């Protein structure tokens, strides 16, 4: 069994962004992009200013320093997107600092635990790796219950509800 216990500062490798699926009928969509709201994205760079409002005239309330960090887009205004992180902090960022590449944070609500990455989409398959809470993983696909994830030195499946960056039951292709 390969044991991969990664530190929270590890970032997942870059991957090409897929075009999001059209929103289901009746779902809220952004007035600028026409994409579903809310939706997940990730930070494109290692330094992203989170602002109080949608312009550079608004004060910076936080600076993210972690490329690949998943965030939830909750609103759109011109070139600005209102986002929320896994801890509930909200603010506005330039759209160019966001990527459609799907990433997830392992076990964000359970900070002191390690989580199994299995060789198949079942708890009965071999454990391929163990990841500490806070590790960022790239999401290849999800079937609504399990996600195929990968990162530096590992690839396998995780229970979807152990990831922040995909909605419960969401299918990702």
Regions found by a protein language model. Give the residues of each.
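SH3-family beta-barrel domains
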Residues: 17-52, 63-67, 74-77, 84-86, ...
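Beta-strand-rich domains and repeat architectures in extracellular enzymes and scaffolds
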Residues: 58-60
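Sec/Tat signal peptide C-region and signal peptidase I cleavage site
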Residues: 12-16
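Bacterial N-terminal signal peptides
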Residues: 1-10
């Amino acid at each position: 069994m390969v044991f991969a216990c990664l530190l929270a500062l590890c970032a997942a490798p870059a991957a090409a962004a897929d075009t999001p699926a059209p929103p289901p009928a009746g779902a809220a969509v952004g007035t600028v992009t026409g994409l579903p709201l809310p939706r997940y994205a990730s930070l494109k760079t290692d330094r992203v200013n989170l602002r109080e409002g949608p312009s550079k005239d608004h004060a910076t309330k936080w600076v993210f320093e972690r490329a690949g960090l998943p965030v939830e887009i909750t609103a759109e205004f011109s070139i600005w997107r209102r986002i929320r992180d896994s801890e509930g902090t909200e603010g506005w960022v330039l759209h160019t600092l966001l990527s459609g590449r799907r990433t997830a944070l392992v076990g964000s609500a359970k900070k002191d635990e390690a989580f199994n990455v299995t060789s198949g989409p079942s708890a009965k398959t071999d454990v391929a790796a163990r990841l500490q809470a806070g590790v960022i993983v790239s999401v290849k696909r999800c079937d609504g219950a399990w996600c195929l994830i990968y990162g530096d030195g590992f690839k396998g499946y995780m229970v979807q509800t152990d990831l922040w960056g995909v909605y419960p039951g969401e299918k990702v292709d």
